[in-house]
Amino acid sequence: MKIGNYQLKNNLIVAPMAGVTDRPFRELCLRYGAGMAVSEMMSANPKLWKTSKSKQRMVHEGESGIRSVQIAGSDPQLMADAAQFSVENGAQIIDINMGCPAKKVNKKLAGSALLQYPTIIEEILKAVVNAVDVPVTLKTRTGWDTDNKNCVQIAKLAEDCGIQALALHGRTKACMYKGEAEYDSIKAVKEAISIPVIANGDIDSPEKAKFVLEYTGADALMIGRPAQGRPWIFQEIHHYLENGTTMDELPTQEVKAIMLGHVNALHEFYGEYLGPRIARKHVGWYLKEHEQASEFRRTFNAIDAAPLQIEALEGYFDNVAS
């Protein structure tokens, strides 16, 4: 699949997730089969660009793969400025967030709250597309609530405004992440527009990935929460789509190597104070299927020193192996 002039190595994309899809996680997912990874959203508020968190999000030098950066906001000019700032700092694709259902984002009339206001959406899309010379994509939801699903209208508007690919999550804003994603709306959008459509929502297995692609006719899949603690899910899905067979479960020692590599990368990227704290949630995701890990997770979450975290993980896997 192509977005503008950029050819993805496959049609599996890492969804932007605040506090998750930082550079270490993106690099890991790309290594294990993702065709592209979208960065966590950056606020269009320029007052926040100078914070240490925003500066870290803008570190793209030497990053592998296509650099897609997501921006969020509701003011057309500020969104245009944020897009330009992102491109100046290495973004090759700009993604506009109109899908986040979080109250923190929606109370500022950003994310999926914008779905109530197509006129503002049009102003934002035109402003961003006209502000940069790179492809602009849009991530959104099926509508505001089940009685107000306007994704086909928004998709047509996006195409008319010059958006070059659209990712659609199969839930409304009101649904948050409850219940199950539905794919009829994604199918309807795919039938209504000619730009690439990327299906998103509950794609948590190779079999589900194949079903969603075939049912919706989507050009690509975007995977978010199922990749938390399982970045190799992209490899599993790609193998299944290519060969029709499922891969064997990764050996425990390989999972250990992936996790230790990820935790070390977090320590290096964020430093000795923040790194161990951010590593905690990732380790929790990696071990969520381990029945024997609940007590270990409580112990691990109390460890503040990076070397002690590595030592604890080594010890945990030694115990599992024995």
From Swiss-Prot:
Positions contributing to FMN binding: P16, M17, A18, Q70, K139, N200, G201, D202, G224, R225
Quote the catalytic residue positions: C100 (proton donor)
Q: Which InterPro entries match?
A: Aldolase_TIM (IPR013785), DUS-like_FMN-bd (IPR035587), DUS_fam (IPR001269), DusB (IPR032887), DusB-like (IPR004652), tRNA-dHydroUridine_Synthase_C (IPR024036), tRNA_hU_synthase_CS (IPR018517)
Keyword Plastid assigned to the entry: answer is: no
Q: Which UniProt keywords apply?
A: Flavoprotein, FMN, NADP, Oxidoreductase, RNA-binding, tRNA processing, tRNA-binding
Provide the top EC class. oxidoreductase
GO MF, any single term: FMN binding
Which Pfam family is one of this chain's hits?
Answer: Dus
* Isomerase keyword on record: no
What is the disulfide pattern of this chain?
A: none
Cofactor(s) needed for function: FMN
The catalytic activity of this protein is classed by the Enzyme Commission as: 1.3.1.-
Give the reaction(s) catalysed: a 5,6-dihydrouridine in tRNA + NAD(+) = a uridine in tRNA + NADH + H(+); a 5,6-dihydrouridine in tRNA + NADP(+) = a uridine in tRNA + NADPH + H(+)
- Tell me which domain of life the UniProt entry assigns to the organism this sequence originates from: Bacteria
Q: What does this protein do?
A: Catalyzes the synthesis of 5,6-dihydrouridine (D), a modified base found in the D-loop of most tRNAs, via the reduction of the C5-C6 double bond in target uridines.
Extract the NCBIfam families matched here.
Answer: nifR3_yhdG
Q: What PANTHER family does the database record attribute to this sequence?
A: TRNA-DIHYDROURIDINE(47) SYNTHASE [NAD(P)(+)]-LIKE
Family assignment?
Belongs to the Dus family. DusB subfamily.
Q: What is this protein called?
A: tRNA-dihydrouridine synthase B
Species per Swiss-Prot/TrEMBL record: Vibrio parahaemolyticus serotype O3:K6 (strain RIMD 2210633)
Taxonomic classification: Bacteria, Pseudomonadati, Pseudomonadota, Gammaproteobacteria, Vibrionales
Q: Which gene encodes it?
A: dusB
